[in-house]
Amino acid sequence: MTPPVTGSSVTESTPTKAKSGGCGCDTSTTVEMDEKLQERIAKHPCYSEEAHHHYARMHVAVAPACNIQCNYCNRKYDCANESRPGVVSELLTPEEAAHKVLVIAGKIPQMTVLGIAGPGDPLANPEKTFRTFELIADKAPDIKLCLSTNGLMLPEYVDRIKQLNIDHVTITLNTIDPEIGAQIYSWVHYKRRRYRGAEGARILLEKQMEGLQALREADILCKVNSVMIPGINDQHLVEVNKMIREQGAFLHNIMPLISAPEHGTHFGLTGQRGPSQKELKSVQDQCSGNMKMMRHCRQCRADAVGLLGEDRSQEFTKDKFLEMAPEYDFDKRQEVHEGIEKFRVELKVAKEKVLAGKEKTASNPKILVAIATKGGGLVNQHFGHAKEFQVYEVDGSEVRFVSHRKVDHYCQGGYGEEATFDNIVKTIADCKAVLVSKIGESPKEKLLQAGIQTVEAYDVIEKVALEFYEQWNKG
C-alpha cells in the first residue's frame, strides 16, 4: 500500500552555488485533457503519467503470430533476460492467461489493466486474443482491457473490440509516408499475400488510418506509438503527430529505437543507431504543442507484470502461477483502490501547497534532476537499489516529468560496483542533482566529483525538487 503523505523529512539539502545556464529545454505543453477523458484514464498506468506512480499493469503472451516484419523487431518466445517489446518467457493459452490474471489480481491488487501486446500482433491472432478478453471480462470485470496492434487488421475488428468493452487501443504507427515505411518494414502480409517496399507500407498506412477513424467513431481511446529511428523517420514524426491528432488519437508515445546487435533485429545487425536522450526529447517537445505526449513508457516485454519500471514477470512464470489458486477478490481490490485514491488526493493537496505562490519567471534557468523512486509520487528509494531514475525538469515554479533512464542497480551483494557506478554517472550526467531516500558516503562523494549533487529525503517529488532548486539558484 502506498504510504500516506507526511511532512518534509529532507535530511540533506545544501546545494552548492548555481552555475550559469540550464538544460536549455522546455517540456511545457498547452495541450490539456478534459475532465471526462482524465476520468477514463485515471487508473491506467500506461495512458496516464500520474497514474503510473500508483497502479500496475500486466500483459499476457497469447498472440505469437505477426502479419508484418518490422526492421526493429525480433520476436523471442523463451527469453527471460531482455526487456523490450516482442519478448516473452513463454506463450500461454487463453485459459492459462485468464488463470494468471486472476492470480496476479489477488497478489497485486493495484493491478488495474490487462493488455495483450504480443509477442506478435493481437489481431493477427484474433481467436486467442478475444477468447482471452472474454474470459477475463467475465471473471474480473473491474480490470480494464486494452490491446496494442500494428493496425493492419484493426478495421475488421473494431466492432468486436467495442462489444467486449475494450476501451483502450494502441496503434504502432511510425510514418505516414510509404517511402519512409519501405525503410522500416521488410514485408506486410495482407489477405494471403506478402507485400514488400512502399506497396506494403502503403497498405499498412491505409488500414491504420481506417482503424484510427473507426476507433474515434466508436469512442474507443487511441494512443499511437511511434519508434524514433534517426536518419529515417526522426524529422518526419512531427508530421505524423499532426496527422494522428487530426484523425482522433489523444496520446502520442514517441519511443527510442532499441537496436542492440545481440537482440538480432535487422537494424541492430546493420548498425542503425537509436536516438540520444537529447534527440528524443527534442522531437517530443516539438510535438507537445499539438497533443499530449507520453514520456513515461518503459517499452515493456509482452509478458510484463507490475508497476512500470518494476517488472515482476519472473515471479509468475507458468510453472509457478499454475500451482497458485486464484485470489481475485473484488471487494478487497476496491478497498485497495480507495486507499490509493485517498492518497492521491492527499498528494495533490501537498503538491498544490508546494507550488502555491511560485511565480513563473522567464529568466529562471531550467535544470534537470534525477529521482530515485519506488512509486507513489515520492522520493523514496535508496540510490544503490535504483534500477532506473526518473528525470524531472525544474525551473523554480514548476516541476515537470521528462523521462526515465534505466541503470543497473549500484549495490549488488552489499557492495557497490565501480563499472555500474560509472554507467550511472554517464546516464544522469546532464542532471544537477540526484534525489534519493538514502545514499552512502562513497558514492555521494564520487557523484559530487562528477558535478552531481545529492539530496537525501523522503517526501513529495515536487517539494524536494523545488527546495533543491531554490538553494541551487541562490548562488
From Swiss-Prot:
CDD domains: NifB (cd00852), Radical_SAM (cd01335). Disulfide bonds: none annotated. Residues 1-25 are annotated as: Disordered. Its cofactor is [4Fe-4S] cluster. SUPFAM superfamilies: Nitrogenase accessory factor-like, Radical SAM enzymes. S-adenosyl-L-methionine binds at residues 72, 120, 172. GO terms for molecular function: 4 iron, 4 sulfur cluster binding; lyase activity; metal ion binding. The keyword Cell membrane does not apply. Pathway: Cofactor biosynthesis; Fe-Mo cofactor biosynthesis. PROSITE patterns: MOAA_NIFB_PQQE, RADICAL_SAM. This is FeMo cofactor biosynthesis protein NifB. It comes from Trichormus azollae. The gene is nifB.
